[in-house]
């Protein structure tokens, strides 16, 4: 019987969610979904002794929530050892830990990137009632001029084994090489307010703020002046594309399947490609319907 070790988070509220996940697996154990031998452990157990000696790669699995305070360290180790892992985090629609909501769960991936066809009528149900709308696609004349760049947080950069500013530096450098110097003023960098900064072990050091920066401006306000949003994996990219703004993301973004590419800036300052709506944009609704998302090959 395969084993599933579910680790807590060292925080009471989110540990309760990992316990609920473990209990859910036990409740639904059957020939199709398992059966799993499930055990819940505190994350300190992994930090002190590592994985249990009876954990077998290719057969058993681990699960946890988030990447801070040891959970990310555990997930990175699982990936390196070829151990399947289930990752939980905020949902893409109705995120948060309070009220009636849900969590996103992905297998062997930090992000849900699977999209499947979903009827547009679904937007008239739950999502419309909770304020979510898939707005009409805007053409270049209906959008602003800013190129809004959203770098990954320190915690995300650490989890993906990147230098703190590696993605940002590469993105800005490529943008400036594609645009004439007279257009560089359009590039606006927006960092996550209260950005989590971690040490080499993934432990939270601080929630960093950037007074006087573009981060102080409400994101909704910045979108009014944006031609495009370029993001590593920020959930703000989902908000942008739902409002008819094109996005350019990394493969670690939930919007990767509707993402444009920086190459569209070759020989043009306002890419005409942005006028065309990604045909699968309405299918982003699928991100709220799936139970387990597995990574798929790029289309």
Positions of predicted regions on the chain:
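A nucleotide-sugar donor-handling region in carbohydrate enzymes
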Residues: 88-161
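N-terminal pre-catalytic "stem/leader" segment of glycosyltransferase-like enzymes
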Residues: 1-61, 155-156
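Catalytic phosphate/metal-binding cores of nucleic-acid and nucleotide-processing enzymes, i.e., regions
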Residues: 131-146, 203-206, 210-219, 235, ...
